[in-house]
């Protein structure tokens, strides 16, 4: 899911919770100012996992900005900022 800087992290975390628990994983990507919202959203989901004693794993990846080439300049698809990608995965309970 691509995160925009205009999202309300708390409201989105409440909406995403049920699907996150059902699917057992979620992946977010953001760039620029939206990375602050991404981190807030992930922290809210992690807090809820901890409150409900749900074990999880988090992976973080920094995706570098794309280099400027004649092809990207012509098509206008160039990303000038690096992107932050965060994955959360619910770990299976050992019973």
UniProtKB/Swiss-Prot annotation:
Origin, by domain of life?
Eukaryota
GO biological process: any one? tRNA processing
One cellular component term from this protein's GO annotations in UniProt: nucleolar ribonuclease P complex
The protein here is known as: Uncharacterized protein new2
Q: What is the lineage of its organism?
A: Eukaryota, Fungi, Dikarya, Ascomycota, Taphrinomycotina
